């Protein structure tokens, strides 16, 4: 039986679910860029890509060399293809304008080029997160500068989302709004091959992911929930839980997507003016779309993440996502 490559899968989606051809091509271009990033990540010190650039991004975070390289790879791969009206990156202050020498398309691409890049130098799994939106008609004029407002759509409007994880294997997890598929990069073939079909997050779990060192800064509902988890079989939840924390959202969410669990990155008292740490557009929305399509849930503690209307490109948000039963429990604690 022949293996199903990403290209074949996307063609079959065009036939069975009327996936537009330009969206199919866009996903393939993003996947090719992810293969190039994977190659750069795997070379590590041999490629001279480790270490800091000595600059900061719009988030005030120190940029790693691979942050900048990954960002450039995604921009250069996608700017010429004619599928996009514009792009937005976690590493850039403003939307990226498609150069006038290239045709424009009907979609917007939003991405975190290298999530978890602080782990690069210690050889921990990192990844690329991306989200695809339709560009509103009023912003499609070929001659106008694309404004930030075109991107400020709730997560429910996403037409596709995915992430690539660069670990022992390079994998691409993808949703087009009809479930989640997992593809593994076959380096001999040079293609992503379907290896995980119809991924489903278990409703309940015995694992959780959170940075426990921040416990003293959490809000009361989060403290209560985690204390109940730690109480184990003798506590109110009646079972023992294991904690896992990699400090790379892609790696933590990938584990939860494949074997269940709950990922938590709550707001805390150190920066009370900020509603959270993670970026809504670049991280929370695409990951929430993927998790929901796999049968899980995602909230900011009080509201479904995909229902949040962004106010700016770099808006932050608290995140609780994963197994539905656990996410509903902690969301309920916030409501009390």
Swiss-Prot record:
Reaction catalysed by this enzyme: beta-D-fructose 1,6-bisphosphate + H2O = beta-D-fructose 6-phosphate + phosphate
GO cellular component terms, semicolon-separated: cytoplasm; cytosol
Primary residence: cytoplasm
Positions with a binding annotation for substrate: 115-118, 211, 277
Record-linked InterPro entries: FBPase_C_dom (IPR044015), FBPase_class-1 (IPR000146), FBPase_N (IPR033391), FBPtase (IPR028343)
Cofactor remark from the record: Binds 2 magnesium ions per subunit.
Pfam family, one: FBPase
Family: Belongs to the FBPase class 1 family.
Assembly behavior: Homotetramer.
Protein name, UniProt field: Fructose-1,6-bisphosphatase class 1
Organism: Pseudomonas aeruginosa (strain ATCC 15692 / DSM 22644 / CIP 104116 / JCM 14847 / LMG 12228 / 1C / PRS 101 / PAO1)
Gene behind this protein: fbp
């Amino acid at each position: 039986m022949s293996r199903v490559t990403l290209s074949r899968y996307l063609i079959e989606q065009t036939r069975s679910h009327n996936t537009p051809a330009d969206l199919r091509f866009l996903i393939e271009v993003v996947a090719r860029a992810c293969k190039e990033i994977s190659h750069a990540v795997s070379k590590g010190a041999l490629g001279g890509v480790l270490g800091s650039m000595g600059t900061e991004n719009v988030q005030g975070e120190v940029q790693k060399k691979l942050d900048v390289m990954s960002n450039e790879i995604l921009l250069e791969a996608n700017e010429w293809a004619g599928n996009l009206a514009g792009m937005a990156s976690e590493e850039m202050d403003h939307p990226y304008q498609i150069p006038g020498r290239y045709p424009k398309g009907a979609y917007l691409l939003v991405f975190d080029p290298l999530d978890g890049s602080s782990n690069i130098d210690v050889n921990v799994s990192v990844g690329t997160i991306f989200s695809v939106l339709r560009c509103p008609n009023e912003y499609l004029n070929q001659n106008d500068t694309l404004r930030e407002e075109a991107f400020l759509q709730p997560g429910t409007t996403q037409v596709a989302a995915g992430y690539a994880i660069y670990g022992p294997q390079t994998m691409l997890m993808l949703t087009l709004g009809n479930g989640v598929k997992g593809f593994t990069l076959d380096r001999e073939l040079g293609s992503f091959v379907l290896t995980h079909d119809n991924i489903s997050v278990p409703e309940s779990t015995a694992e959780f992911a959170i940075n426990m060192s921040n416990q003293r800064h959490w809000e009361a509902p989060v403290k209560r929930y985690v204390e109940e988890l730690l109480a184990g079989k003798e506590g109110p939840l009646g079972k023992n839980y294991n904690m896992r924390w990699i400090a790379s959202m892609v790696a933590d969410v990938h584990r939860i997507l494949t074997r269940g669990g709950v990922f938590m990155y709550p707001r805390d008292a150190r920066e009370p003016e900020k509603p959270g740490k993670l970026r809504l557009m670049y991280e929370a929305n695409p990951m929430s779309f993927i998790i929901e399509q796999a049968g899980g849930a995602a909230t900011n503690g009080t509201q479904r993440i995909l229902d949040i209307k962004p106010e700016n490109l770099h808006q932050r948000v608290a995140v609780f996502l994963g197994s539905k039963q656990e996410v509903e429990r902690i969301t309920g604690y916030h409501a009390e």
